[in-house]
């Protein structure tokens, strides 16, 4: 750059010689005439203008201007950019990152005496003054590069003001065609030139200049119009970009209609560059011969916002945007953080594992197609790292677009994974995945997983439930099980594996519904809409609408041995000044005693091996725990589980409407299996990258818990059985009477059965005998008459003889029973036919 090494010339020397106050007289008078020629006839007006000039502030700083924010994930262990977000499309660059051609074009095109003046071009002002006096207009403004920089800085400051009215006033003051504005601009330009070097001013100008639309700065313009960096701009490209700044509305390269006017101005600038000796004749001729058309202009549309983020990470990008209010690195309060984010320049390094994200996102699109027309099918997959709360995966089956430019069933700006306040929906009922919090509270109260409870569906009075938060409840509550044959007693472990509704209601009847909710809250569980958790009896079976992210983090707390970590999405932030700032702190606390968490995990492991979650199991050698969830009519389906390293929640269901997924067939599989297929696919990749080991064993004290062994009641009378159970803290309920060989009214069997463990206070169901059965007595070896008598005495009424011939040598056995049908010891009805085989020497 020929002029870049020049010292300040005559204008600058004049300013230094005369001093700012004397120079202000010249500038003030010239400005007065420049912006309002009619005022020139009045010396009083000129004097007034000088007074105004002297009273104006003379302090202005070159500050960092709004820039792009960049969001990064991790791919193959290295950062990868997934999104660019900005209020203004600008990337500030350093002096050595700008082409010499661009530096020269700016000076040649905007302020050829830039290196010779003291912030304002006195010659230019004089020339413009003469022109304006002659024409009676204010056509020529004679703004130097420094003045233009001042104006742009003031415009940027105006745009940061909080209200529309304040911004309007400030913008008028910064850019309006008024004498006051021009005088102020001149004063500040003179001051700026005294404070900063020419290089600093020129670079700041190139970084702040507007190039049409929302594009600011030479780097963003180079990328948008030529798909290159500012450092690599050619002479023709640089001159074309500088041609834009005076009149972007008619010279911007965004519109082909502007190409002719842009070329005309470009060629003028190239001529000045040649005249100044900044380019050779050959360079000039080559540049002028370069057309401004679609062959040379390469439009690269700015990809601003999450709609233009990586296709695999758009919803996570939106979650980061919504989480800015939580990033303490950006400021002391949410308002400051939002303002700093708007100003930009931050590089945000997130927790997202791009490798896992890609797998989960592809599975969501393939297995749960949002284009499905038979229902509004939605799905979400969220993975959270155990022990840290770091969000590794956030995928869903729709395509993100918050611009309104696309529409259809497959498009949504709603993030199914998150709470409503973070761009999410109102959440979805989690069904039986919520039962785990009853299991945990059961263990917290000293109960064991081998205790047996009634698993039958039935109707109970809601007044029998304890709820210290919102009770008492009134009216009947009717509930059933998923399978018709699920009834009778179940151990808590078996009920967990098979997801037996009745068993968990029985457990909750021995607990406090409020305390169950508190256990859930300790693991971060809350409603997605922000309302308090409901605690009515049906809440045990999962009626509170929650976000998948919430459930994934809660299960991660169980997998960690009881340490809950709230979900975080940002590892670190690099500020506009290059300083490393903290990300989101892992806010962890002990939510559960390790004995409780490990015993619950022990029960949850059976879900994956022989229970309702078996279809989700990757069977890759990594131990998993989990729980399935299906709401009424299978409107919503869930699979939530974890290894020792990562927890994953998958929701598949109706975004709106009530189409049963069990009746929905897609790709040869019913809708209720989609969750399993997505979870299995995701966790296969998770386990290969984050291999998890064995879970700790259950606490021995919580296997039996505080339960009591049920005694053997068979053969006891009801009073005897009642007394024995009462002494152990149980109650007795007769559920049926059956045919039995035991005396009428005596106990045949109990549920839970003898030897099982039941909670103190449990009702033990018994079945009694009606006495209509008898055991076949032993009659073989008796004389037929004696055998018949014994059978008659036992109540048998139909007896017949079958003659078995004897050899003469066995005459001593004549008349003896050699066999009976049925055989001895068999339980039969007294009305059944009894056949006796009798040996006879003569049949």
Residue ranges and their predicted role:
Residues 108, 144-151, 203, 232, ...:
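Structural recognition of the beta-strand scaffold that forms the well-ordered cores
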Residues 2-365, 369:
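Juxtamembrane regions of bacterial inner-membrane/periplasmic proteins
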Residues 687-843:
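Ligand-recognition elements built from short beta-strands and adjacent flexible loops
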